Structure formats: C-alpha cells, structure tokens
Amino acid sequence: PTAYDIPARGTIAYQYFEVPTNFTEDKWIQAGEVRAGDRKHVHHVIVSVREPQPATPRPNVVSIRPILASAPGAAAAPATASAAPPAAAGGNAFSRAGDATLVNWAVGEDAPVFQRGLGKRIPKGSTLIFQVHYTTDGTPGTDRSKVGLVFSKETPRQEVRTGMIANPLFAIPPGVSDYQIDAEATFSEDVSVWSMHPHMHYRGKDMTYTAIYPDGRREIILRVPKFDFGWQTDYWLAKPLLLPKGSKLYVSAHYDNSTANRNNPDPTKTVRWGDQTWEEMMIGYFTYTVEGKAAPSSAQ
C-alpha cells in the first residue's frame, strides 16, 4: 500500500488500504508473512481478500451466536435478532465481514505455513485489503507495511479458511475482576480445526475454546490461562480436530476491569466493544477446512 504518515499524538481510526492484485488467474497461497513498516506505531495488520462478486455465493458453513454477557453468577442468555449490531457497539472490525482473511501480523504472531495439500485462495481480479491499527507515542512516523506470499505450485486438496467467533454485545462494569463473555459457532458441515487465536485487549484475562459434539460431549481444545495483549499468537493443534456436522465451538473469555489489573487503562469506566486498545474485544479466531469439499477450481 501507499505510505501513511502517523501523527505524534491523537487517536487514529483503523486505516484501510486497497491493493489490486491484477491476477488474471486464481492463486493459491502456501505461506504468507506481513512485515510492519513502522513497528513502533503499528499495533496490528490484517490482510484480507476482497474478490469480485462470485457467480455463485459460497455457502456459509459456520453460524455464529453471541451469548449476552451476564452479571457474575447469572446464567448467560442467547443474543436475539434485536440486539445491537457490532457497529453500534463502537467498533468497525466487522464492517469488512465479506472479505476473507489472508494473513495477519501482531507482536508474537508467526507467519503461517500450510502443509502440502492445503492453501488459501486469492481469486483472479481480487483486491488485497490492508487493515492497519496505528497507535501514537509522542513522536511522528511513516509506515508502509507489506505482505509477502508464497504461491502453491499445484492446486491444493482443501481450501484453508479463517473464522472468527465474536461477541460485541457486552458492557463490563467498573471494578469487576472476573467478567465472563461467551460466544459459539455451529457447523453445518464436517470441519477440521487446525489452529486458534484468542484476541482481547488490556482487560482480557483468559480464553477457552471448547468443542461440543452432536451427542453433547464436551472437550476443551485450548485454554490460554494468562492472556498477554503484548504477545498474541496462533496455537496450532498437533493434529487437526474433526468436528462432525452439528458440532459447536464454544469460546469463553474473562476480563479484569478492576484496580488489580495493572494494565487496565481506566478501572472507573464501563467498557464496551471498540477498536481502540482502551476499549475491548472478544474474538476467538480459528483456522479450519471443510471436510469432503475439494478446493474450488478457477472455473468456480
């Protein structure tokens, strides 16, 4: 993307940069790496693929349900259709929901390398969208972040996808030290989960991913007991976890908005969803493949 001048002070909204690929055929990605141009001021970069309008919309195999946050000790209630949309919660992280995540960068995150037979697709004519979160520190800067991609030499057997299980419907009261926020995904096809990536801000304490099988059996597949906002990473399973059709992936997170949290920007404030680091997010990213589905050809 073009260079961006970062002011010395102030709050900077997420910046979006569009980079046409000019690809005349579909490309498959075996690996990718984002390099921040100004690591003093770049908090994270998310590179997504915005493809031309497909002739046949891709079926959605993941259904996300946020669970309404509850007071400590109370039972969580499912969100309703009348609940406020994410934009009303103060953030725009969902505003590009039609784009497919390609590769991310934040401090602590490794560049993904997919095994042979797997890959992410960039359809011909697509545009790469760089979402960049800048922070200020009293000194100006200039950033021109970039992405490097390794193309597959052959069409993979399966397409790798990135999903996110998120809940923007919360308000963390001042002084609460163990506030719970939950969300879940339900799968309409057999899927294999390959990796997970918890995302919260400074009040985030821990996050747990639990697989719930169609027969009701539960299995904790990832627990991050001490979330570190300054070191975010992907957690890859030793082998992919098969979740049969009808399974759920349940994500539960806890937040500390008390004075005991040394990183708390302001324990006197009620905290809601928002892009900035003094606000909060609850996102459980995960990487998956759909079983029994071959990677789409260029003609699709």
Predicted regions and their residues:
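Beta-strand-centric surfaces of beta-sandwich/beta-rich domains
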Residues: 1-192, 198-300
